[in-house]
From Swiss-Prot:
Family, as annotated: Belongs to the ATPase alpha/beta chains family.
Enzyme category, top tier: translocase
Record's protein name: ATP synthase subunit alpha
Compartment(s): Cell inner membrane
GO CC, one annotated term: plasma membrane
Catalytic activity entry: ATP + H2O + 4 H(+)(in) = ADP + phosphate + 5 H(+)(out)
Organism name: Dechloromonas aromatica (strain RCB)
Marked site positions, Required for activity: S373
Membrane-protein topology: Peripheral membrane protein
Role according to the record: Produces ATP from ADP in the presence of a proton gradient across the membrane. The alpha chain is a regulatory subunit.
A GO MF term: proton-transporting ATP synthase activity, rotational mechanism
Superkingdom of source: Bacteria
Subunit description: F-type ATPases have 2 components, CF(1) - the catalytic core - and CF(0) - the membrane proton channel. CF(1) has five subunits: alpha(3), beta(3), gamma(1), delta(1), epsilon(1). CF(0) has three main subunits: a(1), b(2) and c(9-12). The alpha and beta chains form an alternating ring which encloses part of the gamma chain. CF(1) is attached to CF(0) by a central stalk formed by the gamma and epsilon chains, while a peripheral stalk is formed by the delta and b chains.
């Protein structure tokens, strides 16, 4: 077989013409300086705000400052191996994290990578950490309750699905305890939970995870951890990553609860990053957009309509509304709620639960100040049963606080005032609750009904909780059907009320 040179050249030419080479255009630049996890990169022309950048050693960063001749980027993770002159490439993508039910029961970092030693997470989907909140048209009013299992919260500052309720107080006042109890109480209620721990000690986060595992709560919970040992950038990103994971459930017609513990540390992390990027400081050295930092995060918590769920699922899920409820935590310094970050978050949220050091030290736990704690939209979502019975509790506590201040100066009090003070002390005692022991609706209803109708009035204040426990135990044994009815209907009919009154009266006659 003889080869013809002209045929060979024609063959080569045709192969070259038909060559389909997938060319990839990527902008690249060089590192000019690297300090404290912040890199200045020169030569990146087509870079987006918030875009992921690829550094050597499979390390990623995020472009935050777009200047005329350089880009200020924050490194996500270790940065010791990055040096001046290294090549940095754009990716054309905004930062994404894995989402879906595969993450339930796992502990992940701010980038969605597992840190619990239980192997890789085989999530099928990823989503952007920065998303626009649903518009007004796509939202629905808050009308279904989130039962926290805490008497004082569910009766006086109720939380609804899709609400943002702030938990605010000094350090060591039980803020995390309220949030963790709320997660534990969601067992069997079809509510998925996301716990975002920001800037806490790793040992504290491990303790929370252990408690959730002990109470069987990890099976419906995702923990996003950005401990104090992590970089400021990862502490700043953690709430957005957790929110995206929670939004997956909201947008598939499910209900989710997210806890940010706490947003003060996130604001500190963002302040640190902003100052290192040489952004001009404002009040308390925070950057000018610290309000937007929290508002764009908390506005993503909402109750969305069935039309929104249908649109995002491309018509696969019909007739189901979804919700994402947020319980952000803010730590105050010496009770100063007029500081910059606390006032910002108070103005963004739909109410707040104030926890006070004085109450905590006096043994009133949860240390909730009922006078200044409010829920602006939760009242519409409160269960009928608790709404019907809880009104008297708030009134009794309000009158008690007013009289207690007056009684300090008055030596001789009339009988009516003395009774009211005694009743106030009793109700305050009954609002106490041990940690990790949330109550069901029916148990709460028994306490509220008995307190409202004066069944505890002849009980010593120090024995009130003992009496309450015995009463609930008695009714569970002897009036099991009534308790089941109250739990399932979440209402109290006239007939049920008669049975309840008879049951409590029978218990009181036997209790000493």
């Amino acid at each position: 077989m003889q080869l013809n040179p002209s045929e060979i050249s024609e063959l080569i030419k045709s192969k070259i013409q038909n060559l389909q080479g997938a060319s990839e255009v990527r902008t690249q630049g060089t590192v000019v300086s690297v300090t404290d996890g912040i890199c200045r990169v020169h030569g990146l022309q087509d870079v987006m705000q918030g875009e992921m950048l690829e550094f050597p050693g499979n390390t990623f960063g995020m472009a935050l400052n777009l200047e005329r001749d350089s880009v200020g980027a924050v490194v996500l993770g270790e940065y010791e191996h990055i040096s001046e002159g290294d090549i940095v490439k754009t990716t054309g993508r905004i930062l994404e994290v894995p989402v879906g039910p595969e993450l339930l029961g796992r502990v992940v970092n701010s980038l969605g990578q597992p840190i619990d030693g239980k192997g890789p997470i085989n999530a099928k989907l990823t989503d952007k950490i920065e998303k626009v909140a649903p518009g007004v048209i796509w939202r629905q009013s808050v009308s279904q309750p989130v039962q926290t299992g805490l008497k004082c919260v569910d009766s006086m500052v109720p939380v609804g699905r899709g609400q943002r309720e702030l938990i605010i107080g000094d350090r060591q006042t039980g803020k995390t305890a309220v949030a963790v109890d709320a997660i534990i109480n969601q067992k069997g209620k079809g509510l998925f939970c996301v716990y975002v721990a920001i800037g806490q000690k790793a040992s504290t986060i491990a303790n929370v995870v252990r408690k959730l595992e002990e109470h069987g709560a990890m099976e419906y919970t995702i923990v996003v951890a950005a401990p104090a040992s992590e970089s400021a950038a990862l502490q700043y990103l953690a709430p957005y990553a957790g929110c995206t994971m929670g939004e997956y459930f909201r947008d598939t017609g499910e209900d989710a609860l997210i806890i940010y513990d706490d947003l003060t540390k996130q604001a500190w992390g963002y302040r640190q990053v902003s100052l290192l990027l040489r952004r001009p400081p404002g009040r308390e050295a925070y950057p000018g957009d610290v309000f937007y930092l929290h508002s764009r995060l908390l506005e993503r918590a909402a109750r969305v309509s069935a039309a929104w769920v249908e649109k995002l699922s491309n018509g696969a899920i019909k007739g189901k509304t979804g919700s994402l409820t947020a319980l952000p935590v803010i730590e105050t310094q010496a009770g100063d709620v007029s500081a910059f970050v606390p006032t910002n978050v108070i103005s963004i949220t739909d109410g707040q639960i104030f926890l006070e050091t004085d109450l905590f030290n006096a043994g009133i736990r949860p240390a909730i100040n009922a006078g200044i704690s409010v829920s602006r939209v939760g009242g519409a979502a409160q269960t009928k049963l608790i709404k019907k019975l809880g009104g008297g509790v708030r009134l009794a506590l309000a009158q008690y606080r007013e009289l207690a201040a007056f009684a300090q100066f008055a030596s001789d009090l009339d009988e009516a005032t003395r009774k009211q003070l005694e009743r106030g002390r009793l109700v305050t005692e009954l609002m106490k609750q041990p940690q990790y022991s949330p109550m069901s609706i029916s148990e709460m209803a028994v306490t509220l009904y008995a307190a409202d109708k004066g069944y505890f009035d002849d009980v010593e204040v120090k024995r009130a909780l003992e009496c309450e426990k015995a009463m609930i135990g008695y009714l569970k044994t002897n009036c099991a059907d009534l308790m089941k009815t109250m739990e399932s209907t979440a209402d109290l009919s006239a007939d049920s009320e008669k049975q309840l009154a008879a049951g409590i009266a029978a218990f009181k006659s036997s209790w000493v």
